[in-house]
């Protein structure tokens, strides 16, 4: 049987939000106005101390994983869909939204492209984090049977994370701009031979039927989101664990990075993330992005940052915020220490 020809994603809808104090300021979007349906099956990780009021911006269409993350962490806010990450950043900078929910890492796909570049340039501050388990549902028009399906639409990363079921059923993968957008396109096509891999929320929003649940290859797939605001929050009285995020560039001398990192080791500060990326399309200007445990006012972290600054030509704090409770679930087991090399029965 011949494969159906799939049309390009539809871009006919328009959603324009105007700032009440600036009638000429608007953020155009091809997405419909966000719904207030509650999500199901998402993991909580609320950062205390925030006092959001109106809207939270995210990149993607209504029903996307970023939409679900917004609804889970801030159910009192109105999700504001934005076509691009830049638009989501701009919505906060211009006052169209109080916060933005931006994905930064995925446990399978790795870091989200461009965020490490956009975040330092934006002038926004990280004020929270959220971990969302990523599950994809096979959805189609109501009444569709599995044997009717010939092709499945989704974002390229989602298709890559659902390879097994695609091979089992010999379904043709079709790339869409967005996982939620794939569900919308299936509803618009009204073709029972075309289905979508999308979040559960998308089926509710676009009136689709879920045929198979959690079809992803790896069920521990998780995305970490950062919550951004125009101004930093004061978490000095927060009693729980904190995370501090910053970017830096070291001096172009031998062992500069090694020496810059030494302060974290000698002061007992745990670094949970360290990544490098090139600046400005060059191969000689490298910037590092880091997450560490603690608050800059803590003596240990203050000393470590002081030593880092000595060996750096640039150091910028992006935010200090409460650690998500989910971190306690993914903490390294104590028994892993037994895997370290030993000498005559003693740890070395």
Task: Name each region found by the language model.
Residues 2-348:
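Domain-level signature for soluble enzymes in the chorismate/prephenate branch of the shikimate pathway
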